[in-house]
Swiss-Prot record:
The gene is MT-CYB. It comes from Feresa attenuata. A ubiquinone binds at H201. Component of the ubiquinol-cytochrome c reductase complex (complex III or cytochrome b-c1 complex) that is part of the mitochondrial respiratory chain. The b-c1 complex mediates electron transfer from ubiquinol to cytochrome c. Contributes to the generation of a proton gradient across the mitochondrial membrane that is then used for ATP synthesis. InterPro entries: Cyt_b/b6_C, Cyt_b/b6_C_sf, Cyt_b/b6_N, Cytb/b6-like_sf, Cytochrome_b, Cytochrome_b_C_euk/bac, Cytochrome_b_N_euk/bac, Di-haem_cyt_TM. This is Cytochrome b.
Length: 379
């Protein structure tokens, strides 16, 4: 009799995706982040669900309901900080996952890559609307500043902003709809994840060499399930350390002050994972130009497969491309740092130079260096 795992309609799907899936034998720990992202998503949905049981999406009670969760609900403080720091872990894994894709040429699986970019945008949207919910000063002013960017759109901008707000300023209607968005988006993300995996399993995984590995595959279980469990334990250890020792390390102290439309915080800034994009936005003196640069800083990922000029898929054997890749990472870290600094000399010019370098590296330098490396292959 055939194993039920291979015949039962539901078990068959799980089997083909996580058990008997043929996997390259040489994928490194950089391939762990996919499963870690799945773990983060499950964790965020569960902690978020328990928070939603006690949270009230109303301007008069939102802030105090979060305080109530932290003070009066059993382990409410723990659930709240797991959720807040879980978002940070989510983005760390997300950026590592994208970085892996860029380095090893995984973007050549175009459908998988494009769904991935869509997932990134959905996660960013979820994190943004979620940050508004505690209704602290940075929640309110972050929502005001970022939604206001849409007013830069010619002709329909102002109407669009007021439509999103549900009034003439960020108020009760805005908070209610942001809570609705924050609740529904993770489930949309889950559906997109299924499509992401569907497309990935059509082609199979890439590997560090970038060379097809069809002749050397091993089953996903037990080899990579074990490896994923190790990654998961390290992720949980990091998250618990962050949550139990320094829960507010990555947060903003301003968010412990209730939202006040009459008092603007000295420095309005988003959470750390958006700072690189915020720095790019601020480095352009024109409002519409800044918004376009902000959008392009993320959407540029869609064009990466079209900018592939190298004859080799992976950067494993391309030292010059590796140098540019790590320059890009350093540039993004610089932008992240500058995004958290006040708008004054020397940060303004540094931000502008870092922003120019970001686009220059992706659009010009990397494709050019790839062509030079192609020439060097003939030597």
């Amino acid at each position: 009799m055939t194993n039920i795992r291979k015949t039962h309609p539901l078990m068959k799907i799980i089997n083909n995706a996580f058990i008997d899936l043929p996997t390259p034998s040489n994928i490194s720990s950089w391939w762990n982040f996919g499963s870690l992202l799945g773990l983060c998503l499950i964790m965020q949905i569960l902690t978020g669900l328990f928070l939603a049981m006690h949270y009230t999406p109303d301007t008069s009670t939102a802030f105090s309901s979060v305080a109530h969760i932290c003070r009066d609900v059993n382990y409410g403080w723990f659930i709240r900080y797991l959720h807040a720091n879980g978002a940070s872990m989510f983005f760390i894994c997300l950026y590592a996952h994208i970085g892996r894709g860029l380095y090893y040429g995984s973007y050549m699986f175009q459908e998988t890559w494009n769904i991935g970019v869509l997932l990134l945008l959905a996660v960013m949207a979820t994190a943004f609307v979620g940050y508004v919910l505690p209704w602290g000063q940075m929640s309110f002013w972050g929502a005001t500043v970022i939604t206001n960017l849409l007013s830069a759109i010619p002709y329909i901008g102002t109407t669009l902003v007021e439509w999103i707000w549900g009034g003439f300023s960020v108020d009760k209607a805005t908070l209610t709809r942001f809570f609705a968005f924050h609740f529904i988006l993770p489930f949309i993300i889950t559906a997109l994840v299924a499509v992401h995996l569907l497309f990935l399993h059509e082609t199979g995984s890439n590997n560090p060499t970038g060379i097809p590995s069809n002749m050397d595959m091993i089953p996903f279980h037990p080899y990579y399930t074990t490896k994923d469990i190790l990654g998961a334990l390290l992720l949980i250890l990091t998250l618990l350390t962050l949550t139990l020792f320094t829960p507010d390390l990555l947060g903003d102290p301003d968010n412990y002050t209730p939202a006040n439309p009459l008092s603007t915080p000295a420095h309005i800034k988003p959470e750390w994972y958006f700072l690189f994009a915020y720095a790019i936005l601020r480095s352009i003196p024109n409002k519409l130009g800044g918004v376009l640069a902000l959008l392009l800083s993320i959407l540029i990922l869609i064009f990466i497969p079209m900018l592939q000029t190298s004859k080799q898929r992976s950067m494993m054997f391309r030292p010059f491309s590796q140098l540019l890749f790590w320059t890009l990472i350093a540039d993004l870290l610089t932008l992240t740092w500058i995004g958290g600094q006040p708008v004054e000399h020397p940060y303004i010019i540094m931000g502008q130079l870092a922003s120019i370098l970001y686009f220059l590296l992706i659009l010009v330098l990397m494709p050019t260096v790839s062509l030079i490396e192609n020439k060097l292959l003939k030597w």
